[in-house]
């Protein structure tokens, strides 16, 4: 999904009103179409100020309107590990935050955004679980199929 954010960011600055609007329109349309087609989707995002607090509710509505089901999973990472990873070059490829100073400045905002998220049916520590293993764990736990 980072490619979508990158495509939108090529036209509108990250976090701008139009960036947020277009990114969210794509996300919601993709959820709806995938649910309608019977495709399971594992989608991740970091709760932060550019994601509307009611986004999870609207995502649920988009999926359920197409006959699908949405399950929330929480991915966690320790502060130390997050700070260790923040400067990794692969983060630039996905347009992710890379400044340790900015991360520290925004941490309270991130925590407030995360606190507003719906309860998770599963929590995974990404410090000890690689991305492929996490996606397999999610798919297996909730019997997800490709459709």
Spans of features found by a protein language model:
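Short, hinge-like loop/turn segments at secondary-structure boundaries
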Residues: 13-17, 60-61, 89-92
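Switch/connector loops and helix/strand junctions flanking conserved nucleotide-binding motifs
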Residues: 52, 79-86
